[in-house]
């Protein structure tokens, strides 16, 4: 193959073999571990990929072929390794029954992606939980890493580029503002700016 596409992450599929405590937490022993890693009753202490998925990615990267990593997830997973080593990274969340077709359309260039992250993706578990109304201290990082998210709320890429101009802000009332601007697609491909 010219390119390696690795799909990693987890599942929220109910396998109906899992039993639950009164609190809703899943009961599983080593012989009967569900592949479900997200959803009601499946809290996790880590954002890491489960099982040997990271080892798989490292092995695939060692082939020296371009590596595209697609994350299927219901919560932000640790993407630090992929952000540093993969040639492309796509977060698909749980895309539903047509998700495979939609992912293929993006990867093969039949659709120009326009989606943006609905959450910030942390670099580490130490950055969560995130309170969106909490102001971050100025110039305060962790000892071993930046305090900024790996990918911020609203981040996303496209095969197109866009230019903004003619920004106008008009105050309509004490707490009511109207904002307008022009958006121009300056890229080679048709696209949507979200």
Describe each PLM feature range.
Residues 1-194:
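C-terminal non-catalytic regions of proteins with extracellular/luminal or membrane-system context
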